[in-house]
A protein has these predicted regions:
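Intrinsic disorder at enzyme termini
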Residues: 1-13
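Structural signal for well-ordered, non-membrane alpha-helices
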Residues: 13, 17-21
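Glycine-rich flavin
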Residues: 18, 25-117
Length: 117
């Protein structure tokens, strides 16, 4: 089995790595003020969304990037390497949204997915 990234995956990895290097905030996990942590994480998720890195595997018509699972894995790996904080809505992005995408009606998708991003 070949576990090497192909050229497009390497290109995406390099894009993400450069963007995170230029934009990632410091990890705030030691911040005592939880309100500040929540504020920071919301701002971070907004910045990630505006750059196209939230909802990577979600369909474009619901605000996602339309990427594949490998794109998401590459992004997750680069977030770990860069030691960035998680976005505020990790559960909604990773669990809630995908359930709505898979099983929701068109009306539910339009109503519930965009606010999760």
């Amino acid at each position: 089995m070949d576990f090497e990234l192909d050229d497009s995956e390497k290109s995406f990895r390099d894009e993400v790595r450069a963007w995170l290097k230029a934009n990632a905030p410091k990890d705030d996990s030691t911040e005592a003020n939880q309100e500040k942590v929540i504020e920071n994480r919301r701002a971070w998720q907004k910045k990630l969304y505006e750059a196209g890195y939230v909802g990577i595997t979600w369909p474009k018509e619901y605000g996602g990037r339309g990427g594949d699972f490998m794109d998401q894995l590459i992004f997750n790996d680069e977030m770990i390497v860069a030691q960035t904080p998680e976005p505020i809505n990790v559960i909604g992005l990773g669990m809630g949204g995908p359930v709505v995408i898979a099983h929701g009606t068109e009306e539910q998708k339009k109503r519930y997915l965009p606010p999760l991003l």
